[in-house]
């Protein structure tokens, strides 16, 4: 039954509502809407560079971020940021450790992850990647982290991604993985081959998960001013193939990447795009 209120009662209730001391009663027959939950992203390699910038940009846009890295104790900037931003949760994860991947996936089993962002990667020792110095151990290390680990992460977290609203798996790739641009690349066999393998692996993954409604994004962040980019440019200069494209800041790259992630649809899924140019990359 509804409550009949006189003028005094209405005035009193209005005052209490304004002070936040009472909540407005639900109207008869009108369900109270559930609070909207923020989208959730899990990022690998969140302690520095592009990963840390992605964490900040996503939080700015209202995302909850599960920020992972190998050693949070050494990630002071990330820990300080998380302490000031409740939307950030830090988790320890070495993406080359399958057991650690499965344990973290088990921890979040039953929880939705809108965007699984595979950002962690390495360049490897460039001096060991020249034709005269090739050896299998170094190649296996770079290939495992850059190409295999994102697939392993996708397998482990597929149920959480499939249960989400956005259903996105993102691979942070590189223009170095494009066969089209390979003639201009420096002598960095392991790194370039690993990124080409990542691109193909993600394209095959898209075929596998399309029936679940999952979208797989393959994206280059552009020439970002990070430690990896500095090492890449130094090696390129040594072999006489200097990189002349000006570098951009991690924050600028993160804005482009999040624009790409939020705008990812079926038309771009399984294809290689540049967040720097906003165009598809031939590969």
Can you annotate each of these PLM segments?
Residues 82-99:
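Rossmann-fold cofactor-recognition segment
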Residues 221-231:
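Short, flexible catalytic-loop segment of classical short-chain dehydrogenase/reductase
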């Amino acid at each position: 039954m509804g409550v009949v209120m006189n003028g005094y009662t209405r005035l009193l209730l209005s005052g209490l509502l304004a002070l936040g001391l009472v909540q407005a009663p639900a109207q008869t027959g009108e369900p109270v809407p559930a609070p909207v939950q923020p989208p959730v992203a899990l990022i690998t390699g969140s302690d520095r560079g592009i990963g840390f910038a992605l964490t900040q940009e996503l939080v700015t846009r209202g995302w909850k971020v599960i920020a992972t890295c190998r050693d949070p104790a050494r990630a002071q900037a990330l820990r300080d940021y998380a302490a000031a931003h409740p939307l950030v949760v830090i988790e320890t994860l070495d993406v080359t450790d399958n057991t650690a991947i499965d344990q973290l996936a088990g921890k979040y089993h039953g929880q939705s992850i809108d965007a699984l962002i595979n950002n962690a990667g390495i360049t490897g020792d460039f001096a060991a990647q020249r034709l005269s110095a090739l050896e299998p151990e170094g190649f296996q290390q770079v290939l495992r982290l850059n190409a295999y680990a994102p697939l392993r992460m996708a397998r482990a977290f597929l149920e959480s991604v499939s249960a989400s609203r956005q259903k996105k798996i993102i691979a942070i790739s590189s223009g170095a993985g494009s066969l089209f641009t390979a003639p201009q690349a420096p002598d960095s066999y392991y790194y370039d081959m690993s990124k080409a393998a990542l691109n193909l692996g993600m394209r095959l993954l898209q075929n596998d998960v399309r029936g679940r409604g999952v979208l797989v994004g393959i994206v280059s962040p552009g020439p970002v001013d990070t430690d990896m980019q500095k090492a890449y440019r130094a090696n390129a200069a040594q072999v006489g193939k200097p990189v002349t494209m000006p570098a951009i800041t991690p924050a600028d790259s993160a804005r482009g990447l999040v624009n790409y992630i939020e705008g990812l649809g079926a038309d771009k899924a399984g294809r290689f795009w540049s967040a720097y140019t906003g165009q598809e990359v031939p590969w």
